[in-house]
Swiss-Prot record:
Entry annotation: catalytic residues: P2
Organism ancestry: Bacteria, Bacillati, Bacillota, Bacilli, Lactobacillales
The keyword Repeat is annotated on this UniProt entry: no
Keyword field contains Glycoprotein: no
Family recorded in the similarity comment: Belongs to the 4-oxalocrotonate tautomerase family.
Full protein name: Probable tautomerase SP_1017
Amino acid sequence: MPFVRIDLFEGRTLEQKKALAKEVTEAVVRNTGAPQSAVHVIINDMPEGTYFPQGEMRTK
């Protein structure tokens, strides 16, 4: 059962996230042979001020 987690800065519309989840699901099915019903896509909206690569705050 493939789980795909995507972390994005918040601000995408629901329609954008639906389209992304659909395309990611199709890619997982195509490349792994997993049935579509087994693929789970989790999109996490990250508020600004919560991402610190190399210890420095990253913004959009």
